[in-house]
Each structure stands twice: as structure tokens, then as C-alpha cells.
């Protein structure tokens, strides 16, 4: 028996999120079917996190147990030969049998892309949030810095979260530019349900002048979801990296 850790890139547009659901096309379900085609085994693919419908991943991590004789380094090519084009296995390594892509993770990085131009993008419509109004990028950068540290992020968590605690440590948060978009990067030891999208929505409100950067500590302290910005749509969000 081996424990195989995959690094996966996917376009979440056509899927109902990561987690397997009855009669719905999901990332987990699609990859498990591909593994079954190769090995004949029914496996349980454990992802580092359950990305929502429409969310993308550059380096999602997931592990599964197998008795297959396929060499570990051959799994990417073999799986990609049977997977659809919007899912790609980038790497495969053998992990210890007690390793879990979910529970062994120490930190994750997400980014959120905002397309801030007057004209609506056609090619980026499923890959960035369109915001045509003027933004104060310097204020947004200052707002990012207030998120760094260990806090109770209850204000930045959807009400239907099942988390045992809302305390998380944010290691880094910053703003940059890429692919004609504003990119908000957040690295933390874990993310609450919709936390990255709510933080991005709050930073956007700062850029729009609805909030000030120094409002962020007050919003965190309030532990009140209504004080933070809206939850931005899923299609601007990307799982960038997972560290073990």
C-alpha cells in the first residue's frame, strides 16, 4: 500500500466545487473516476481543502491510498491521459502512510483577482471579479497589512461555517498586479468558510472608499459579520499553494 500525494491545477468553472456530491460533476469525483480507470480501485481522494463551485486551483494538494503497481512518477502523465482538459495533475510523490493532505497542512495561500477597468472583460469573465469603478490601491495595500497576525476572524466567516474555532493566523497579506488584474494574496494557517472572499470584499470596500484601512482592526474586534465587506463571487478566487 502506498500513499500518493498529487499536486493539481484546475479550472473550477464547470464543476460543483471540490467535494464529491451525488449526481453532480465535482473535481474530487472526476479525479477519483480517473484513478479507478487506471488502477481499478475505488479510492478516497483527500484534498487539502474543499474549494467551492467556480473556485480555481493552481496547486491543490490531495492524497489517496493505492495498491497499484504504477510508478509514482508516472501518475501525472497517466491520469492526465484520462482526465478532462480543465484538470491537470502537475506532480505526484509518495507520502508517509499517515500523511493527510487536509490535516497535515500547515499553511495555505489564496489569491483573489479583481479586473479594474471600465470595459467588461470577455476572456476573464470566469477568472476575475469585474469592478469598473476607481479604486485607491494604496489604501487597499494598507488594509492588507491589518489582517496579518493571529485574530478571531468571526467577522470574516459565513454564518453556516462548521469550524470549531474562528481563530486563525494570517502570515501574509498583500496586493500586487498580474494579468491586468489587482491580485490580493493571503497566506494563513487555515481559512474559515468564505474567509478569503470576505477579506477580499472588505479590501475592495477600502479601495472604493466605503471603509478606511484603520477600520479593519475594529471590524476584526467586533466579531460581527455585518461589519465586513460582501462575499465576492467564487470565480475570482484561486488556491495558490499548500505548505506541509
Swiss-Prot record:
Mitochondrion among keywords: no
Cross-referenced Pfam families: PseudoU_synth_1
GO biological process, one term: tRNA pseudouridine synthesis
Gene Ontology molecular function terms on file: RNA binding; tRNA pseudouridine(38-40) synthase activity
Enzyme Commission number, as recorded: 5.4.99.12
InterPro entries for this protein: PsdUridine_synth_cat_dom_sf, PsdUridine_synth_TruA, PsdUridine_synth_TruA_a/b_dom, PsdUridine_synth_TruA_C, TruA/RsuA/RluB/E/F_N
The keyword Isomerase appears for this protein: yes
Residues reported in the UniProt entry to bind substrate: 110
Catalyzed reactions: uridine(38/39/40) in tRNA = pseudouridine(38/39/40) in tRNA
Positions annotated as active site in the UniProt record: 52
This protein's UniProt keywords: Isomerase, tRNA processing
EC top class named in words: isomerase
Subunit field text: Homodimer.
Role noted for this protein: Formation of pseudouridine at positions 38, 39 and 40 in the anticodon stem and loop of transfer RNAs.
Similarity comment: Belongs to the tRNA pseudouridine synthase TruA family.
Protein name from the UniProt record: tRNA pseudouridine synthase A
